[in-house]
Amino acid sequence: MSKTIATENAPAAIGPYVQGVDLGSMVITSGQIPVDPKTGAVAEDVSAQARQSLENVKAIVEAAGLKVGDIVKTTVFVKDLNDFATVNATYEAFFTEHNATFPARSCVEVARLPKDVKIEIEAIAVRR
């Protein structure tokens, strides 16, 4: 049995999907673009965009009663792999700040993302 996750601390879905799904032992987030849920703003800088996407993922995971340390897999979609080092630095800092081990991860370059943002991140977390 799955349960829809909804929180005001992450942006509302911009299509026919939910922010996340709680499967009981596992939480799966939809891809999070770097929209500030309070203002709707998107930063220009890829580092700030990466941080906001991660904060949005965190909000969904926390809405399900889990924490950053429960994330076991992420997929990172970037518009330009030349931003890889910058994204990595932001990603590393985020997980380090939350005293979390790094999850498994895939990172791919894509042609375009919604709202023409530079990054989108989705995650899987497990209830331990």
UniProtKB/Swiss-Prot annotation:
GO terms for molecular function: 2-iminobutanoate deaminase activity; 2-iminopropanoate deaminase activity; deaminase activity. InterPro entries: RidA, RidA_CS, RutC-like_sf, YjgF/YER057c/UK114. It catalyses: 2-iminobutanoate + H2O = 2-oxobutanoate + NH4(+); 2-iminopropanoate + H2O = pyruvate + NH4(+). It comes from Salmonella typhimurium (strain LT2 / SGSC1412 / ATCC 700720). Keywords: Amino-acid biosynthesis, Branched-chain amino acid biosynthesis, Cytoplasm, Detoxification, Hydrolase, Isoleucine biosynthesis. Homotrimer. It is found in: Cytoplasm. Its main location: cytoplasm. It is an enzyme of class 3 (hydrolase). GO terms for biological process: isoleucine biosynthetic process; response to toxic substance. Belongs to the RutC family. Pathway: Amino-acid biosynthesis; L-isoleucine biosynthesis; 2-oxobutanoate from L-threonine. The gene is ridA. The record marks 120 as: Important for catalytic activity at high pH. This is 2-iminobutanoate/2-iminopropanoate deaminase. Its EC number is 3.5.99.10. Substrate binds at residue 105. Accelerates the release of ammonia from reactive enamine/imine intermediates of the PLP-dependent threonine dehydratase (IlvA) in the low water environment of the cell. It catalyzes the deamination of enamine/imine intermediates to yield 2-ketobutyrate and ammonia. It is required for the detoxification of reactive intermediates of IlvA due to their highly nucleophilic abilities and to avoid they are captured by anthranilate phosphoribosyltransferase (TrpD) to generate PRA, an intermediate in the alternative pyrimidine biosynthetic (APB) pathway. Optimum pH is around 9 due to the greater stability of the enamine/imine intermediate at high pH. It comes from the Bacteria. GO terms for cellular component: cytosol. The keyword Transcription regulation does not apply. The record marks 17 as: Stabilizes the substrate. Disruption phenotype: Cells lacking this gene appear to be compromised in their ability to synthesize isoleucine. Mutation results in the partial block of at least one step in isoleucine biosynthesis subsequent to the reaction catalyzed by threonine deaminase (IlvA). Mutation is required for the dependence of the PurF-independent alternative pyrimidine biosynthesis (APB) pathway of thiamine upon the oxidative pentose phosphate pathway. Changing residue 105 to A: Deaminase activity is defective. At pH 8 and 9.5, strongly reduces the increase in rate of 2-ketobutyrate formation over the rate of IlvA alone. Coiled coil: none annotated.
